[in-house]
Amino acid sequence: MATKLTERQQEILDLIRQTVARTGFPPTRAEIAQALGFRSPNAAEDHLKALARKGAIELTAGASRGIRLKVPDSATPSAQLTHPLLAQLVLPLVGRVAAGSPILASEHVEREVGVDPGLFAQTPDYLLKVRGMSMRDAGILEGDLLAVKRAAEARNGQIVVARLGDEVTVKRLQRQNGRIELLPENPDFAPIVVANTDEFALEGIAVGLIRTQPLH
């Protein structure tokens, strides 16, 4: 990050880092505005655009949580996977998962990659290559690598990797009145209601994200 930040910009950047460390995902514009006393999310948006121009973050247009922290020392997004100083944690990269087989079965692991453990809220167990755009508005895009910590339980509202029948999907978990729903973050996709007769299991919770392609 070559350009010096203003005091307010640094406050916003610190808030983004703290939120990512706590939840695994960045805050919304409304959450930034509320936390820092802005009159509207538009004020937060102006500061975010300034941070993006200065190279501190990347923004995904149209996504409420589409904020990506940049790697220090102006490394490119793909350098998070290859830069020797950042490659302190080696994780299996899981591609497509075959029906009925364990997610970390050897045939699903495309390769192992080295990553900076400081990128994540909690230490992940594996990376999952994202397929599709159903979680776009959470800033999770096609081809991104979702950092996942294995877990059989999750809190309401967490983004999870779930197995439903023969499919593995990334969605936001919602439990309400004894019913489980898997919610997309894109209005083009419908929520998935888990029936009592469905084979359902949690494979893990999302603790961070790596973008391998630059935003356009």
UniProtKB/Swiss-Prot annotation:
Q: In which family does this protein belong, per the annotation?
A: Belongs to the peptidase S24 family.
Question: Which EC class heads this enzyme's classification?
Answer: hydrolase
Concerning HAMAP family, the annotation shows: LexA
- List the protein's name: LexA repressor
Tell me the organism.
Answer: Bordetella pertussis (strain Tohama I / ATCC BAA-589 / NCTC 13251)
Reaction(s) catalysed by this chain, per the record, are: Hydrolysis of Ala-|-Gly bond in repressor LexA
Q: Which Pfam families match?
A: LexA_DNA_bind, Peptidase_S24
Out of the domains of life, which is the source?
A: Bacteria
Q: Does the keyword Membrane apply?
A: no
Q: What is its EC number?
A: 3.4.21.88
Give the UniProt keywords, A-Z.
Autocatalytic cleavage, DNA damage, DNA repair, DNA replication, DNA-binding, Hydrolase, Repressor, SOS response, Transcription, Transcription regulation
The free-text function statement in the UniProt record for this protein reads: Represses a number of genes involved in the response to DNA damage (SOS response), including recA and lexA. In the presence of single-stranded DNA, RecA interacts with LexA causing an autocatalytic cleavage which disrupts the DNA-binding part of LexA, leading to derepression of the SOS regulon and eventually DNA repair.
This protein's assembly is summarised as: Homodimer.
Under Gene Ontology molecular function, one entry of this record is:
serine-type endopeptidase activity
User: Where are the catalytic residues?
Assistant: 134 (for autocatalytic cleavage activity), 171 (for autocatalytic cleavage activity)
